[in-house]
């Protein structure tokens, strides 16, 4: 879900904005105004709060079950072996912890950590104090020794050469060493017996005491290590024994050593022995194996003599992989099951099986959300990497913005909007001194036209938008890509539906609005009425104290056009429009079409940078190099700056109108982004297809008989295609639905005719024609191809075709009423009624109803109708008659009502 305002959330849940604001406050979120945005995280928190408030608990436990089957050979009592299927079932439960319990555990862990740190600090202080006392004691001993050495009378030159050193060892242990100084070697005849002095004796005693203390500490340390090794060995044995029991042992991390203590030493010794045997070549027991090993050793010796190193020594030829390959799986917000399986290098059915165990039924082409996909990836032993759908495009846009520089003033982009036939194109023709309106089919604009005009006040770029109701998307794109909106209103016609829609588009885009009241040259012009109607839509003129500039003009005579251009230039100066001139070009696709001999032709409006011939352009889902560039007059140009519309050639397909384009330098990056957008669009289409399939299923359950009008549609440009598709979808009713089998841009081809023939569809062309092959195919198949140049005609013909598919409407018409005055018996008909016709005409062969006390009690046919004993076919008002009702006995006072059912054709 995207970020939404409080007002949008209220509209989604059909509640008032104040109620949604109160719910946000109850959920613990800060108070928001109606126009403030609510982030996705806050929306999820609000939904969680509402679920809990309605008594719905969050699902905290997910159980996963797996089953593996293997075959084992077992020897029976008779000595024969047989195969036995061994089935191992495992169950794994993922339980989401309770937030309260998590908070308690976290607090307990923090308290334990604080206590541990306090104990560690206290131990460190005790060790420091002990070390200090030991050093002081050793220093005192050394001082006493030095004092005794100075006062000794038996000191001689040999004793003076004694050097005393204090060595402080690690752990606070201090030893005193007494060493004689080195003397030059002299030749002596005989060695005199060495006499131990008092200082040497004292030093020896201190050294012996210290060595004894060290031996005690070492003995204690060895004993402690032996006990710890024994504990680790027992624990390791318990873990190894647990693998052969039904209950799984405690999980051990992959990075822990295989074994410790006695077991680890034994395993290590075994591995070392195997490595030594491999090196010596004694691991092969058979003669054949010994022969191969001998030959291999001879080759190794020969290679060593030649200065080569054998790559086969001290290792096996083949090592079976013992660890599973773990992938880092990138998961977007929506991903299909097949794509997820491909990224994990497994088959799609493995993922679907795991989904079924989790309670999700999904096919390979179905999409799953990011959370479910992450759980699947973790269960299969891989690392999920959540990726945002817009990360690639955001990085691309950031890189493009960093390369932009040299900001300069750019021309304004002005969009002309208004109701159909209010003079928008005529106004542009007068400004450009052209005659575009006279060449438009039906006299109305059906495409977005882009022009840049050099006026006395500078260059201005104009966008001409259609005014027909079907082109709402085009007008919305025009308002988004523009700087200023000029709203054209006819002075003799006033506000119309598309005029109000244009005002809404301008407000939604936050674009300044300038009103041009056109057709002031007509006698029926009433500008005050237009001002009143605009004020009702909160568009107040500056003349009436508002902030909307208005100009009274005449596109026919040219009056007021200079004033309008002056208002546009003034508004552009106030906006201070700027754009970087250097760097890669960025902009928006205005329109795209497919021309024979030229290929895809794309009309673009440059917003930043400079577009040059040869640039690599990425537009929507397609990319390619610009082979040629032309302006609106068809003249070849080499470059186009900001706010300049151009037509480019070189893209492989026609991009969607309204999509943004960007110039890149790296073709690999362009291909990556294009593939990403293509995959995203494919996922969206799959979602729409699933939704349509579900919707059609419900429709078939609710409605037993629905007719479909199949259509194959081809248009000249993408904008017209979007407008027609939207208009045709709006024509669908509960009884007749429009189904567009295929649509595209370009001329009608043979494949279109074949598709229309196989699907029994109507083939329609809007401003395009069929090629020679398609015409021959249509003649052979006796298929009619309809061509249109005005959108009115196409929509009207589709409505007529849908009306012909509607079931006729049945209506009852009362033809006559007769009162039963008397009932008598007839030997031929039984009960017969004498009646007076009080209204209309009574017909013998029409259905009748018998009314008693103004309630229908019988519906059937007349068996006989007579007047004066003669059989007649009808009796008019004011005449008496006798009649007999087939299968029913009437009574005096009843009314006989004659009616007929008429059929009426229905229309859309």
UniProtKB/Swiss-Prot annotation:
Boundaries of every tr-type G domain copy: 409-578
Q: Where in the cell is it found?
A: Cytoplasm
Superkingdom of origin organism: Bacteria
Q: Which residue intervals are annotated with compositional bias (Basic and acidic residues) in the record? A: 94-108, 120-138, 176-185, 193-229, 270-280, 294-303
Q: What residue spans carry the region label G1?
A: 418-425
**Does the keyword Protein biosynthesis feature in the UniProt annotation?**
yes
Its principal location?
Answer: cytoplasm
Region described as G2: 443-447
Region (Disordered) location: 52-229, 241-316
Keywords of the record, alphabetical order, are:
Cytoplasm, GTP-binding, Initiation factor, Nucleotide-binding, Protein biosynthesis
Q: Where is this region: G3?
A: 464-467
Q: Keyword Protein biosynthesis on this protein?
A: yes
Record's compositionally biased regions (Polar residues): 65-84
Positions bound to GTP: 418-425, 464-468, 518-521
Region annotated G5, chain positions: 554-556
Q: Name one GO molecular function term.
A: translation initiation factor activity
Q: Which GO terms describe its cellular component?
A: cytosol
Q: Where does the record place the region G4?
A: 518-521
Supply the HAMAP family for this chain.
IF_2_B (MF_00100_B)
Summarizing the function annotation, the protein's role is: One of the essential components for the initiation of protein synthesis. Protects formylmethionyl-tRNA from spontaneous hydrolysis and promotes its binding to the 30S ribosomal subunits. Also involved in the hydrolysis of GTP during the formation of the 70S ribosomal complex.
Family the entry assigns: Belongs to the TRAFAC class translation factor GTPase superfamily. Classic translation factor GTPase family. IF-2 subfamily.
Its protein name is Translation initiation factor IF-2
Q: Which organism is it from?
A: Psychrobacter arcticus (strain DSM 17307 / VKM B-2377 / 273-4)
Q: What is the lineage of its organism?
A: Bacteria, Pseudomonadati, Pseudomonadota, Gammaproteobacteria, Moraxellales
Q: Name the gene.
A: infB
């Amino acid at each position: 879900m995207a970020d939404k305002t409080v007002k949008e959330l209220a509209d989604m849940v059909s509640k008032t904005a104040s109620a949604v604001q109160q719910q946000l406050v109850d959920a613990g979120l800060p108070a928001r105004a109606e126009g403030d945005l609510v982030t996705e995280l806050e929306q999820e928190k609000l939904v969680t709060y509402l679920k809990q408030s309605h008594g719905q608990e969050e699902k905290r436990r997910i159980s996963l079950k797996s089953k593996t089957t293997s075959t084992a050979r077992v020897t029976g009592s008779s000595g024969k072996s047989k195969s036995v299927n061994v089935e191992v079932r495992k169950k794994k439960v993922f339980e989401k912890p309770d937030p309260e319990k998590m908070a308690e555990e976290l607090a307990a862990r923090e308290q334990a950590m604080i206590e541990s740190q306090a104990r560690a600090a206290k131990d460190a202080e005790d060790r420091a104090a002990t070390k200090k006392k030991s050093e002081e004691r050793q220093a005192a001993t050394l001082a006493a020794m030095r004092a005794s050495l100075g006062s000794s009378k038996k000191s001689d030159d040999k004793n003076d050469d004694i050097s005393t050193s204090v060595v402080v060892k690690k752990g606070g242990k201090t030893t005193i060493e007494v060493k004689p100084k080195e003397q030059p070697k002299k030749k002596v005849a005989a060695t005199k017996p060495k006499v131990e002095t008092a200082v040497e004796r004292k030093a020896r005693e201190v050294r012996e005491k210290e060595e004894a203390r060290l031996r005690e500490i070492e003995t204690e340390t060895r004993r402690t290590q032996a006990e710890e090794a024994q504990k680790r060995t027992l624990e390791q044995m318990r873990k190894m024994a647990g693998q052969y029991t039904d209950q799984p042992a405690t999980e051990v991390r992959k990075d822990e050593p295989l074994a410790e203590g006695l077991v680890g030493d034994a395993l290590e010794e075994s591995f070392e022995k195997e490595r030594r045997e491999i090196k010596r070549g004694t691991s092969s027991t058979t003669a054949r194996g010994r022969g191969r090993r001998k030959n291999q050793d001879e080759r190794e010796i020969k290679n060593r003599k030649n200065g080569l190193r054998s790559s086969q020594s001290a290792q096996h030829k083949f090592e079976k992989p013992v660890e599973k390959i773990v992938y880092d799986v990138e998961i977007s917000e929506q991903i299909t099951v097949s794509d997820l399986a491909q990224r994990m290098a497994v088959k799609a059915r493995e993922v679907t099986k795991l989904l079924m165990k989790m309670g999700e039924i999904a096919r390979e082409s179905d999409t799953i959300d990011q959370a479910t996909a992450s759980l699947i990836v973790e269960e299969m032993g891989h690392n999920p990497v959540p990726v945002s759908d817009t990360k690639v495009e955001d990085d691309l846009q950031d890189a493009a913005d960093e390369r932009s520089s040299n900001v300069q003033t750019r021309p304004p982009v002005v969009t002309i909007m208004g109701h159909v036939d209010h003079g928008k194109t005529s106004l542009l023709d007068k400004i450009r001194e052209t005659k575009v309106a006279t060449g438009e089919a039906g006299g109305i604009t059906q495409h977005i036209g882009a022009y840049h005009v050099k006026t006395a006040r500078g260059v201005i770029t104009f966008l001409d938008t259609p005014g027909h109701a079907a082109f709402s998307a085009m007008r919305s794109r025009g308002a988004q890509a523009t700087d200023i909106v000029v709203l054209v209103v006819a002075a003799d016609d006033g506000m119309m539906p598309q005029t109000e829609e244009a005002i809404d588009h301008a407000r939604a885009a936050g674009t300044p609005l300038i009103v041009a009241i056109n057709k002031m040259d007509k006698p029926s012009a009433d500008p005050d009425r237009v001002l009143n109607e605009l004020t009702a839509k909160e568009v107040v003129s500056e003349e009436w104290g508002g902030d909307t500039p208005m100009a009274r003009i005449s596109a026919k005579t040219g009056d007021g056009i200079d004033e309008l251009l002056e208002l546009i230039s003034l508004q552009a100066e106030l906006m201070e429009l700027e754009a970087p001139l250097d760097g890669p070009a960025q902009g928006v696709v205005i329109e795209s079409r497919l021309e024979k001999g030229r290929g895809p032709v794309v009309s673009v409006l440059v917003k930043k940078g400079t577009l040059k011939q040869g640039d690599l352009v990425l537009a929507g889902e397609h990319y390619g190099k610009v082979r040629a560039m032309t302006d609106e007059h068809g003249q070849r140009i080499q470059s186009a700056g900001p706010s300049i519309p151009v037509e480019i050639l070189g893209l492989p397909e026609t991009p969607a109108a309204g999509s943004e384009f960007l110039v890149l330098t790296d073709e690999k990056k362009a291909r990556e982004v294009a593939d990403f957008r293509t995959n995203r669009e494919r996922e969206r289409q799959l979602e729409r297809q699933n939704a349509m399939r579900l919707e059609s299923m419900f429709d078939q359950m609710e409605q037993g008989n629905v007719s479909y009008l199949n259509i194959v549609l081809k248009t000249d440009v993408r904008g017209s295609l979007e407008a027609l598709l939207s208009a045709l979808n709006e024509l669908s009713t509960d009884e007749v639905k429009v189904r567009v089998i295929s649509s595209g841009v370009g001329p009608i081809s043979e494949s279109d005719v074949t598709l229309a023939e196989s699907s029994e569809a109507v083939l329609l062309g809007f401003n395009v024609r069929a090629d020679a092959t398609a015409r021959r195919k249509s003649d052979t198949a006796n298929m009619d191809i309809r061509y249109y140049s005005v959108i009115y005609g196409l929509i009207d013909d589709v409505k007529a075709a849908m009306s012909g598919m509607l079931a006729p409407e049945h209506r009852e018409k009362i033809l006559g009423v007769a009162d039963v005055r008397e009932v008598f018996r007839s030997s031929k008909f039984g009960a017969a009624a004498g009646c007076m016709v009080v209204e209309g005409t009574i017909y013998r062969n029409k259905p009748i109803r018998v009314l008693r006390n103004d309630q229908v009690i019988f519906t059937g046919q007349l068996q006989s109708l007579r007047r004066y004993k003669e059989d007649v076919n009808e009796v008019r008002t004011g005449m008496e008659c006798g009649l007999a009702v087939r299968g029913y006995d009437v009574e005096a006072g009843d009314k006989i009502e004659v009616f007929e059912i008429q059929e009426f054709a229905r229309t859309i």
